[in-house]
Design a protein with these regions (language model features):
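Mobile genetic element proteins and their domesticated derivatives, centered on retroelements
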Residues: 7, 33, 55, 87-90, ...
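Short, solvent-exposed polar/charged micro-motifs at secondary-structure junctions
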Residues: 40-44, 120-122, 287
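Phosphate/oxyanion-binding loops and surfaces in catalytic or ligand/nucleic-acid-binding neighborhoods
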Residues: 56, 106, 122, 126, ...
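Conserved beta-strand -> loop -> alpha-helix junction used to position metal-binding or nucleic-acid-contacting
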Residues: 87-142, 263
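Acidic/histidine-rich catalytic cores and adjacent linkers
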Residues: 94-96, 136-307
């Protein structure tokens, strides 16, 4: 038997033999995202670029932070000599400027799921973790602009009708009844997600015409929304092109799920706490990228060389 230390040494030597194979061709449509890691208790940033069409990882490296300088350097390193047409990124305000400086003709798709998280955050900032059913319905109207949430909206309409029919004018008792209805909705959404997962279905995407129509109705009724969501509606309208690129170019994905899945598949939450040096981080990320791209890490011949 071999000691854990010896096996770890074999592992690191084998990883050090892995040579990075730089992409010589790409689709021109990419995900870019970041993940924060720990190195000896210090936070560092993992910068990653993935081709949306081929699925290949073009970059997976660590830097001390996610400054504009670090991001520009990473993008240039990953994409130098390759076509650059579009990116899907989250809604960080720095990304459009960075991309425009490096690639003036590149288009941007903002991650719709990131938009949904912001909408939910703004809703709970105004109303707490248990917003009124009507405000919850308004939030789902916004979710429904780019993805089809008709099923959830119909359920909320049913619950709102029951609430209006059964409330008695006693504030405390009405609030308790609304709380029961909110719980019913949460259970409904949870079961809906499970059903979609079992059946391998995603939430359907809206077409550009559907999005335009739904958003026009929201703008017309914007006075019924909370103040923060009214402001969010204005921002969506201002940046409409960055939310709808996926509807105008079939290669572009509406969310950053494609790179989030890579992060989840390659480093678990516990793994992220285990790095003791910059070398260990670089070694692990190099192995993640190589293995994802189909390189064999531990061939019989390489193991014999290590011995």
């Amino acid at each position: 038997t071999y000691s854990p230390q010896y096996l770890h040494e074999l592992y690191t030597q084998a990883i050090d033999c892995v040579k990075f194979e730089r992409a010589t061709s790409a689709s021109g449509v990419y995900y870019y995202d970041e993940q924060f890691l720990k190195e000896n208790g210090r936070e560092i940033c993992r910068l990653a670029v993935r081709d949306q069409v081929t699925g290949k990882m073009l970059l997976d490296k660590a830097d001390i932070d996610a400054s504009e300088t670090a991001i520009k350097k990473a993008l240039h390193e990953a994409l130098d000599g390759l076509p650059v047409e579009a990116f899907t990124v989250d809604m960080a305000v720095k990304y459009p400027g960075i991309i425009a400086e490096l690639y003036p003709n590149a288009r941007i798709q903002w991650c719709i799921f990131h938009l949904h998280k912001i909408i939910w955050k703004e809703l709970t900032e105004e109303f707490g973790k248990n917003p009124p059913l009507q405000q919850l319905y308004n939030a789902y109207l916004l979710f429904d602009v780019f993805f089809d949430h008709t099923v959830e909206l119909k359920k909320l309409e049913e619950l709102l009708a029951r609430f209006k029919k059964c409330r008695i004018g006693d504030q405390k008792r009405d609030q308790e009844f609304e709380k029961v209805l909110r719980k019913e909705f949460r259970t409904f959404v949870k079961e809906l997600k499970k059903q979609r997962r079992r059946e391998g279905n995603n939430v359907p995407r809206r077409t550009i015409d559907q999005s335009v129509s739904n958003f026009a109705i929201i703008k017309h009724q914007s006075a019924l929304f909370s103040k923060k969501l009214q402001h969010r509606i204005e921002l969506i309208e201002k940046n409409w092109g960055r939310y709808t690129l996926f509807q105008r170019d079939a290669r572009v994905q509406p969310t950053n799920n494609g790179i989030e899945q890579y992060f989840a598949a390659t480093l678990s939450k516990t793994d992220k706490k285990d790095f003791r040096s910059a070398g260990a981080v670089a070694r692990e990320l190099r192995a993640c990228q190589a293995e994802w791209n189909g390189q064999q890490l531990f061939s019989h011949s390489r193991l014999l060389e290590v011995f």
